[in-house]
Amino acid sequence: MVTTDSGAVRGAWHEHTSADGRTSRHAVFRGIPFAAAPVGQLRFAAPQPPVAWDGVRDATQFGPTPQRISPYNPPRVPEPSIPGEETLNVSVTTPDPSASAGLPVLVYIHGGGFIGGSPASPWYVGEAFARDGVVTAVLSYRLGFEGFAWLADAGRDGVVNNRGVLDWLFGLEWVQRNIAAFGGDPSRVTIAGQSAGGAAVMRLLTMPSAQHLFQGVLALSPADASSPVEATAEATRRVAQASGCEPTAESASRVHEDVFFAHREAVDSPRDPSQPRIIFKDAPLALAPCVDGEVCEQTVSDALAAGVGADKRLFIGSTAHEFTMMLSPSRQQLAGLDPVPLLVEAGASEELARDVVEDARERGELERGTAWVLGQAISDVIFRSCVAHWAQTRKGGPAPPGRTTSGGSRARPTSRARRTASTSPSAWTCCPRRGSRRRSDRSRRRRSPTSCTPTGWASSATARWTPPSTATAGRPSSTDRMPVIGAWSRHTGCRSASGTRSTPRPPPHPAERPAPSGLTLIFASAHPELHPSHRVKRRSGA
């Protein structure tokens, strides 16, 4: 039993056996409200404290989810929808639920394009982190119209905009007040997320109002959560019109959330291949965190350039095939179509479109079909270019991109994030996805040079980062081990396994051609004195 500032909760003890046969025991506390149910007058308001309860509340089952039905058909990730009103809740997994434990904390924000996703996924329970002495907390937040619609009557009767962002802040405040009771140290918090969750943590990193809530950031395949007011207001107007109401809280409160969800899909769906304009022209996530000058004061890029969050540790990267699987159901619909006019229609120049297709042909990927080529273009423009740009913009020096290769296999982004989170011993590890050990070793010798970070890595094909302050006695602290840049010579000019060194290439512009398959990793440090030009001797066992 653990006592929070709203009341006592009772969790359950679970056992976990890892792939290497290690067994560990951890406690789980699920569905704990961190805010009042966002219904009635609170539906479009800022989050408010939950109603306190007497006695001991059962916390052995996941709580209600903001997602009522998955927007992905078929679902790509096991993220269940659970009915109920108390949708703003947190689930905690801890190896030691005692106030004296003082363990590091990982707070995870799920993805789903800000219209879907669930904190109740079995992929997010954090068993492996608990095994290695890390407390995990998974937050929910309002989605779609409920969380991100731009309402014209904001400022009256408690109505606010950027409600989903305010939910993140409120959840992190709950962590600061309560995580010590679960064995966590509120001064050692790392926030993490993948896809829209990665965008969320980058958004939080660049918000002055959030700086006291965490010390490190893990952003996996983040998109740019910096929608302009005009784009969000227009998307809100279209959804409201299709749903039979005005873009105000007063009018929208009479419409059920499922109606907004259905028309959000019909009006502007990023999974509809008949609307390729979303790739280059329009904001792909219009109902998303909005730069309003108040909650979100600046774009992520501008805030990074201004040095906001420069004292925080940052791990940022993206999968090479972030969006290809999203277009897989449309493979037959797009089969045989020339991708060049589709890319031009999407806003790319004809020269760029032909470059994209030619690059796919050179890599032998054109035979995979038009859906694959379009998916790669979306991955590059929406996700991978953000990673390179933000790492370069990060105050403290340039950060050329690096990659680990995966033999051309398709990367399923959340499954990779899940494996990273669930199997790494107190670290986030990115490595080749498929193939035998022997084949992987051959691949490493052939094309995986060593890292050129100031500290080096244990393996040329594996990148690790330990969350803040999780290093054990006798080992370097996480600050000492934090890399500035992870980069590999075939693409960036860093020193290779053979000891050769070529001229570094700058990070790709968003309009550049897609990069080879694999996993893109960028590591950016808060320490400006650590720069890739500092050549170091490779160290083993880091």
List each model region and its residues.
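Non-catalytic accessory segments of hydrolases
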Residues: 1-162, 435-450, 460-466, 485, ...
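Serine-hydrolase-like catalytic core of hydrolytic proteins
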Residues: 72-249, 304-327, 396-398, 463-464
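C-terminal, loop-rich substrate-recognition/catalytic regions characterized by aromatic stacking residues
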Residues: 47, 309-358, 486-511
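Intrinsic-disorder-associated, low-complexity terminal segments enriched in Asp/Asn/His/Tyr and depleted
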Residues: 509, 527, 531-534
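Mobile gating loops/cap/lid regions near enzyme active sites that modulate substrate access
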Residues: 69, 384-514
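Short, intrinsically disordered C-terminal tails of secreted or membrane-associated proteins
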Residues: 536-541
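Substrate-access "cap/lid" subdomains that shape
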Residues: 177, 211, 220-342, 375-392
